[in-house]
Amino acid sequence: MKILKKHLNTVTMKVKITLMFAVVLAVQACQAQDLSDSQITVKILSYNIYHGATTRGDYNLDVIARVITDADPDLVALQEVDFNTNRSGHIDLATELGIRTHMAPLFGRAMYYDGGEYGEGILSKYTFIRTRNVPLPYTPGNEPRTALEAVVVLPSGDTIAFVGTHFDHLNPETDRVAQAEKVNDVFTSSPYPIILAGDLNAQPGSIPIKILEEIWSASYDKIYPEPTFPSDAPRKTIDYVMHFPGERWETLETKVICDSIASDHCAYLVTLKLLKD
């Protein structure tokens, strides 16, 4: 009887250990899944920073940096970025914002301006492994435009490309149409899943946006697109995040962040999930 009881106790202990081991494995599997999901989720912010000036007319980069930091993006496309211009006090806006947000900065010149340079910026939580600055077509006499690209590696090990741009603001939309066509021609041949973000100065349904959406998938609500400009009373949707190819990305969340002091534009935050092949 004692032998049988001892045997039963041993079996019971083995069952308990087995169950505990199974629970541990299940928890580890869930944690691994959560980690995997977080590793392939990318938060993108598009932000026209009004050449570093607030809507009050002063230069307060801490206000702009706070909007970015509070949004906690992985990659930021900055538009209207000054480098060493007279009006911004001869500072490097991209680098200064990078310092304040603890992100790697990148600047791409669209034109020489006011004793310095003016163009696009990118901030990134990840190291740049390749960058390029692509001039976009424009009508002589109009403002030159560019598209700035950075290739980065995510914590998951996946490589993606990120492009920030700022299309022409004038009418007719001749330059915007040409710029949309150039972006399609240049960047959709990327060997990596790619994200496009920026102030496109065009509303949903316009010709430039239709051209882009022939190839790119947009993140905004097609039925009720949320306006992003001006920041004090938004009524126009002109800031975008798009991605390509469509089957590699899923839009998880979008958010328009309006700080009426930091800039005349709202910031546009989009959370994307990179899907496996």
Predicted segments with their positions:
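Metal-dependent phosphoester/phosphodiester hydrolase catalytic core
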Residues: 154-174
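Short, solvent-exposed loop/turn elements at domain surfaces
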Residues: 51-58, 132, 173, 228-229
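Soluble or luminal CAZymes and related metallo-dependent hydrolases
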Residues: 56-63, 89, 142-144, 175-182, ...
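Active site of divalent-metal-dependent phosphoester/diester hydrolases
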Residues: 85-90, 103-122, 141-144, 191, ...
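N-terminal, active-site-proximal structural segment of metallo-dependent hydrolase catalytic domains
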Residues: 8, 14, 19, 23, ...
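Structured beta-strand-rich core segments of catalytic domains in phosphoester-bond hydrolases
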Residues: 35, 41, 56-57, 75, ...
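Active-site beta-strand/loop signature of hydrolases that rely on acidic residues for catalysis
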Residues: 42-49, 64-88, 150, 161-165, ...
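Active-site-proximal beta-strand/loop segments in catalytic clefts of secreted hydrolases
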Residues: 47-50, 79-81, 108-111, 124-126, ...
